[in-house]
């Protein structure tokens, strides 16, 4: 029985709430405006709705000033994100995405930090053809963005293949069961005829006509690997395995990475474990958690609208009590678990049933051909002969998974022929790096990330080598803005773009993803970054204890205070 009456924040709904309310369940005027050839863009109201269909309108910011001088509209283009729970793609689907990127995109694919594909550079008049082709490959872009449950993540851990297979099936079921029920996507992109007369309450029984106050993210981790950063999720499930069998999941609620520069009422937060559920109870837990956010989330101030703020405002125990009240049963006590890292394991790993997995290092998650490295071509050739699957990891890398023994030699030869790398000749720091897209396509970016981090790493590696730390894993993450797509606050070294060439520098996150970082220096450029890291890494090399990770060292050495909760992130 709930002992405290919960309520949503007071305040007038934001304009986005108006747009959703008037959208006729995410239809708006998208069908009409996508036929318009006068402009390559679309009205803002429709762009807000477009997210729920898996796409954002962007423009090439490298060209923005020049086009303004020429009195031309911005170089509008669309980013399209695929819904692909668990990050698993068949070779046939890989080839379709490769082909679409060449025909309609910018010739590259982005492997995201949520285990899916992003295509950039799609023109408005090519969007429908692109989505229809994706649909023909048994994929879709429904709810890949927007105020709904996003792509459900799942551990890619090759060491527990039998558990991965089972957990992956649960991630797919969860993703499908939590989809919006509106037929808007099918009508606009797939030419489905609208069926009239459906009662409103039947259209979206879980989401309702306003959907959620903000995005909602779910991920499933399989200890000891926290590769999906389970504590960064709105709702995290931690697989509990006993005697080689999956018995259920610990449930964690209230995580999220985004914040706003200069606003201490916004902050990253880690999800807290509140109990345990059996696999067959997972959907019920997810659905009821989502309805709590639907009913009590902040619909007035979008920067405070994520579920983490709802949990912090209402109180963890009150939210747990409300969840159990809606479930009609109580969560079991959480089971013991242990994480020891949140990175990937590179190279060949033997799985079960005579299958092998090869994890490829993909810097920045960008699949393209370089002058001296034909990454995209090599993967295309592998996809033509591969009989297993591809797994996109949460660290923007790629696993060529379930390679049969009789195919291993052929796949190995192609890896060798195209020089595809497991990254082991790079520093462990580079292999533990992650960056969001940022410029030139992201409209929120304040500074470079993906295009700049490799160059910065070249210079940091000189310091690493000087101090004998080349094989020391240190997680380093860079984002072009504070929204946190590359989960900057969980990097032992983190950078958030503040202005062109300027970053806030963060230290002190845990190597296993269980502690947030804290700001160390504000608004600094490359020279200061390198100067600070030279001092810090030198001290780490000399003063660290046996097995001590960098994020732990800077706290023990008094260099930075530990962030014990997101609410003291700014302290």
Curated annotation (Swiss-Prot):
Residues that coordinate or bind [4Fe-4S] cluster: 436, 442, 481, 485
Gene3D superfamilies: Sulfite Reductase Hemoprotein, domain 1
Pfam families: NIR_SIR (PF01077), NIR_SIR_ferr (PF03460)
Keyword Ligase set for record: no
InterPro entries named in the record: CysI, NiRdtase/SiRdtase_haem-b_fer, Nit/Sulf_reduc_fer-like_dom_sf, NO2/SO3_Rdtase_4Fe4S_dom, NO2/SO3_Rdtase_4Fe4S_prot, NO2/SO3_Rdtase_4Fe4S_sf, NO2/SO3_Rdtase_FeS/sirohaem_BS
Any single GO CC term annotated in Swiss-Prot or TrEMBL for this entry: sulfite reductase complex (NADPH)
Induction: Up-regulated by sulfate and the transcriptional regulator CysL.
Enzyme Commission number(s) of this protein: 1.8.1.2
Keyword Cytoplasm: no
Positions with a binding annotation for siroheme: 485
Reaction it catalyzes: hydrogen sulfide + 3 NADP(+) + 3 H2O = sulfite + 3 NADPH + 4 H(+)
Gene knockout outcome: Cells lacking the cysIJ genes are unable to use sulfate, sulfite or butanesulfonate as sole sulfur source, grow poorly with sulfide, but can still grow with thiosulfate, cysteine or methionine.
GO biological processes: cysteine biosynthetic process; hydrogen sulfide biosynthetic process; sulfate assimilation
Keyword annotations from UniProtKB, A to Z: 4Fe-4S, Amino-acid biosynthesis, Cysteine biosynthesis, Heme, Iron, Iron-sulfur, Metal-binding, NADP, Oxidoreductase
EC class (word): oxidoreductase
Cofactor(s) required for function per UniProt: siroheme; [4Fe-4S] cluster
Pathway(s) served: Sulfur metabolism; hydrogen sulfide biosynthesis; hydrogen sulfide from sulfite (NADPH route): step 1/1
Manner of cofactor binding, per the entry note: Binds 1 siroheme per subunit. Binds 1 [4Fe-4S] cluster per subunit.
GO molecular function, one term: heme binding
Known function: Component of the sulfite reductase complex that catalyzes the 6-electron reduction of sulfite to sulfide. This is one of several activities required for the biosynthesis of L-cysteine from sulfate.
Subunit structure and binding partners: Alpha(8)-beta(8). The alpha component is a flavoprotein, the beta component is a hemoprotein.
PANTHER family in the record: SULFITE REDUCTASE [NADPH] SUBUNIT BETA, SULFITE REDUCTASE [NADPH] SUBUNIT BETA-RELATED
Family: Belongs to the nitrite and sulfite reductase 4Fe-4S domain family.
Protein name: Sulfite reductase [NADPH] hemoprotein beta-component
Organism name: Bacillus subtilis (strain 168)
Gene transcribed to yield this protein: cysI
